[in-house]
């Protein structure tokens, strides 16, 4: 059992090292897209399922409240956080539309959709991205594995941050780290001299 535990840590560390080599440019581009949207008076919509939903909510909470330093609130909405809306849509057997309907209702040109999907194939996330395209929104996609269907939907101005792993747990761990990096970059770009 102890060797298995050590193996989990080792695999996580190795994935982090690979991501540190592969992802800085994509993370930087994503952060700049998010910053530019906020500077233009737009907002960030976030969505995901399961652990990805938790990461989406963590991002939105860090924007609205704060990440590590006190600063003004920033507009972000986790589309998976409103249970009444979610259950109303799924009650009508529109599971695949659970986020797309919200994107069509709330999304505006210049907004960003932060779409988080471990494999990139979740139908409701794919539909949300398709809806964001029709609203002229920028998409930042956090994926893993081969990027899935999401990777094929992205345009030139969109950004995919694909975790270099085919293990769901490692992808999800690195998604959380990536979300924290994005929050840090946004704060340090918009509020460079803020202290705790």
Swiss-Prot record:
This is DnaA initiator-associating protein DiaA. The keyword Metal-binding does not apply. Belongs to the SIS family. DiaA subfamily. Keywords: DNA replication. Gene3D superfamilies: Glucose-6-phosphate isomerase like protein, domain 1. GO terms for biological process: carbohydrate derivative metabolic process; DNA replication. Homotetramer; dimer of dimers. It holds the Pfam family SIS_2. NCBIfam families: PRK10886.1. InterPro entries: DiaA (IPR023070), GmhA/DiaA (IPR035461), SIS_dom (IPR001347), SIS_dom_sf (IPR046348), SIS_GmhA/DiaA_subfam (IPR050099). Residues 34-196 form the SIS domain. One of its GO terms (molecular function) is carbohydrate derivative binding. Required for the timely initiation of chromosomal replication via direct interactions with the DnaA initiator protein. The keyword Aminoacyl-tRNA synthetase does not apply.
